[in-house]
Every structure is written in structure tokens, then in C-alpha cells.
Amino acid sequence: MIGMAEKKVKVKTPSGKEAELAPEKVWVLAPKGRKGVKIGLFKDPETGKYFRHKLPDDYPV
């Protein structure tokens, strides 16, 4: 369920800026028997802090 991806996504960083970043890790977060959401782990280029953000449904896992 955890994959690596290179496709860039427009996300809002913790510092409040919009940036186009590629997630370092992608996984699906889903309750049993229901459709899940895709979550990506991103690294803020300015501060170096990691943060999570929801990805579009058509994003490859």
C-alpha cells in the first residue's frame, strides 16, 4: 500500500505558501470496506519539515 511517486502536486506548505512538490511517500488511508483517501508525505523546501497532504483520487499509488 505504500508506494513511491514522482508526479508533482500543488500543495499548501506549513509555512502558508503554495508549492508544486512530488510526495516522498504515498499511501491509502481507508476504513474497513470503504473507499479511502490517498495521502502523500511531502518535505517543505524552505524549512525542511515533513507534512502530509491529501492527494487527488486519480494519483497513482
UniProtKB/Swiss-Prot annotation:
Keywords on record: Chromosome, Cytoplasm, DNA-binding, Methylation
Keyword Glycosyltransferase: no
GO cellular component: chromosome; cytoplasm
InterPro entries: Cren7_sf, dsDNA-bd_Cren7
Localization: Chromosome; Cytoplasm
Origin superkingdom: Archaea
GO MF: double-stranded DNA binding
A family per Pfam: Cren7
Post-translational modification: Methylated at multiple sites, to varying extents.
Similarity comment text for this entry: Belongs to the Cren7 family.
Subunit structure and binding partners: Monomer.
Free-text function comment from the UniProt entry: A chromatin protein, binds double-stranded DNA without sequence specificity. Constrains negative DNA supercoils.
Xref: HAMAP family: Chromatin_Cren7
Entry protein name: Chromatin protein Cren7
